[in-house]
Amino acid sequence: MSADSKVQLTALLRAALKSIAPELADTPIHLERPKQAGHGDFATNLALQLAKPLRRRPRELAELLLAELPRSTLVAATEVAGAGFINFTLAAGAKTAAVGTVLERGAEFGRGARNGTSVQLEFVSANPTGPLHVGHGRGAAYGASLAAVLDFAGSDVTREYYINDAGRQMDILALSTWLRYLALYGLDIPFPPNAYQGDYVVDMARAMREGHQDRFAGFTIEQVLEGAPGLPVAERKDDEAKTQREDHLDMLIANAKRLLGEDYHFVHGFALNEQLGDGRDDLEEFGVHFDKWFSEKSLFDTGLVDRAVAELEKRGHVYLQDGAKWFRSTAFGDEKDRVVQRENGLYTYFASDIAYHLNKYERGYDRIIDIWGADHHGYIPRVKGAIAALGLPPEKLEVALVQFAVLYRNGQKASMSTRSGEFVTLRELRREVGNDACRFFYVLRKSDQHLDFDLDLAKSQSNENPVYYVQYAHARVCSVLEQWGGEAAELRAAQLDLLGNERELALCARLGGFPELIQNAAADHAPHQIAFYLKDLAAEFHSWYNAERMLVDDPALRLARLALATAVRQVLATALALLGVSAPQSM
């Protein structure tokens, strides 16, 4: 039951429609797979669509359509259901044909024709100020899987990581590294609570000392702290205390730049490269690859931020207030106007984001997809507003949101905070449960739904663990084929019409729906549909495996069942690969 079956059914309905209402022959025909097994293989609401223009009752129209439906070996049964839906049950041969198609196409089964659409997909884009954490991991798994699905569906995908290397957070990381470095030389400066606290900062400081000895030392505590306001006691959480801590940090950054001179750029670059390199390695080990790493700093170096803001000014969308430049984002649906350039002349993060999206548009992609954390939901109107203000089509930009993943260990939530240094890193998670469990569990839900990640379940070797359950189905087929010991070429001669019991036909139908699933998952930005499909396919295979023998005495039936099992193995492997999960031959 493949996409071809759907095309053929559509053609049959079109012919029937021409017979009863030629003037409506071009009406779009929608065929869907019923959610309940007893409602056939496909259903259409065409009669309900036509009821009003034809002034007929839907059920009456459904009966008329079926009466005019051309005869076809594709259809085994039809029925009118409910208010006027038409259900179709396909002939067994239409379902088993999918097995032959899978064996013929192999790993290419389900791949869509190249559609000429170029897609720029930006994801993860975490500040390179510390190790990637489990929240970044979900965005990475979702983005990588979506990219794979879009590519498999026929698009040309560029996977891009935006490096936030030009903002204040990088200055804080550089300062944090330098202060830890100075401490190695005995300079006991109180470490700011709002600097980066993790052990990785100490590791970077040690690496900097090992490579450059005392090149960045030789300063006094008084020099480093010059002009910095005192730090309030840790217990104070009020706004004034927060402002004092931030002012203290900013003065230390200014002092570091002044004292180090050109060497500050080296320390800044050292910290950036250490963290960026660590993040790249982490992602590569996770099976997440990028085609392009785009530097925020390059937007300033090439003058694109200046140009973007100047263009907004030229178009009348920027005004001056209190010495700052504001973008009129309220004119484009935002809740308030946004600063693009502060009174001190420094651009905001928003200004560089505008320039970055202008760059994306100028590169000529057909579609631009940003994957953001769900906490950035309010950012969408201002970015799309800026795009529209630049005279560009905002609808070209699509934003997919990813909710946070919450880890549970022994039934307890695991806490995390990147600025306090107490966080669960992606690397730690991968080492605990493995890459496969991480990649699969991260896409088990829609990206914009909260995800509770059960560590104990992810590590268990049981049918309750979905990734284990799916991989075990693949390994089971491999074991059966090894016992058989025949050649794969023999399977193409299998008499597929011998596959006739309910479980076998259900498996065939599931396989046949894979190409359509790929297109739907790509259109909906929904790799979780692949995960759901894998769980269903594995469940149907295990049910069949437990009920029937593969290696029966009858050679023809044995070959037919082995052909079906091999087709199941292929689709399992293909779908798992799209999610970045391995397909083991034994378990």
From Swiss-Prot:
<dbReference type="InterPro" id="IPR036695">
    <property type="entry name" value="Arg-tRNA-synth_N_sf"/>
</dbReference>
<dbReference type="InterPro" id="IPR009080">
    <property type="entry name" value="tRNAsynth_Ia_anticodon-bd"/>
</dbReference>
<comment type="subunit">
    <text>Monomer.</text>
</comment>
<keyword id="KW-0648">Protein biosynthesis</keyword>
<keyword id="KW-0963">Cytoplasm</keyword>
<dbReference type="GO" id="GO:0006420">
    <property type="term" value="P:arginyl-tRNA aminoacylation"/>
</dbReference>
<feature type="short sequence motif" description="'HIGH' region">
    <location>
        <begin position="126"/>
        <end position="136"/>
    </location>
</feature>
<dbReference type="InterPro" id="IPR014729">
    <property type="entry name" value="Rossmann-like_a/b/a_fold"/>
</dbReference>
<dbReference type="InterPro" id="IPR035684">
    <property type="entry name" value="ArgRS_core"/>
</dbReference>
<dbReference type="InterPro" id="IPR001278">
    <property type="entry name" value="Arg-tRNA-ligase"/>
</dbReference>
<keyword id="KW-0030">Aminoacyl-tRNA synthetase</keyword>
<dbReference type="Pfam" id="PF05746">
    <property type="entry name" value="DALR_1"/>
</dbReference>
<comment type="similarity">
    <text>Belongs to the class-I aminoacyl-tRNA synthetase family.</text>
</comment>
<keyword id="KW-0547">Nucleotide-binding</keyword>
<keyword id="KW-0067">ATP-binding</keyword>
<dbReference type="InterPro" id="IPR001412">
    <property type="entry name" value="aa-tRNA-synth_I_CS"/>
</dbReference>
<dbReference type="InterPro" id="IPR005148">
    <property type="entry name" value="Arg-tRNA-synth_N"/>
</dbReference>
<dbReference type="Pfam" id="PF03485">
    <property type="entry name" value="Arg_tRNA_synt_N"/>
</dbReference>
<dbReference type="Pfam" id="PF00750">
    <property type="entry name" value="tRNA-synt_1d"/>
</dbReference>
<dbReference type="GO" id="GO:0005737">
    <property type="term" value="C:cytoplasm"/>
</dbReference>
<dbReference type="InterPro" id="IPR008909">
    <property type="entry name" value="DALR_anticod-bd"/>
</dbReference>
<keyword id="KW-0436">Ligase</keyword>
<protein>
    <recommendedName>
        <fullName>Arginine--tRNA ligase</fullName>
        <ecNumber>6.1.1.19</ecNumber>
    </recommendedName>
</protein>
<dbReference type="GO" id="GO:0005524">
    <property type="term" value="F:ATP binding"/>
</dbReference>
<dbReference type="GO" id="GO:0004814">
    <property type="term" value="F:arginine-tRNA ligase activity"/>
</dbReference>
